[in-house]
Amino acid sequence: MSYKKGIFNPKNPKKYNGNAENIVYRSSWEFRVMKWLDDNPKVIWWASEELPIPYKSPIDQQVHRYFPDFIVRIKRKDGQETTMILEIKPESQTKQPVRRRKTARFIQESATYAVNQEKWRAADLFCREHGWQFKVLTEKDLGI
């Protein structure tokens, strides 16, 4: 994942649900998705890191707040509207880490994976309770 950071300036600020003057992207992948959301006429509104979802960390057993990358409301081909929560992650962080010689790295990757799984479980539950969808998009989904 490319770690380009900055402030996104939307062409269509009225589509943004939040402060359109402070839309932060934390990677070139997020920037790419923001451009797509801003330009796509089927996107009714979108937001970035605006919704906190509580989850219990498997690392410290404390409740934390997860801010998903995007919340999107789109108009489908059938005319119905759908709300989705989207998370952008490298595919490597969506799979159980494989033990390697570097134990410290394996421990860190395992912790990241465990925390991500719990965040995504909480987001999926939140979405099901609200009639929304939850998706994790990787570089393959983004065509990178």
State where each predicted segment sits.
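Electrostatic, structured charged patches in enzyme active sites and in nucleic-acid/phosphate-binding
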Residues: 1-144
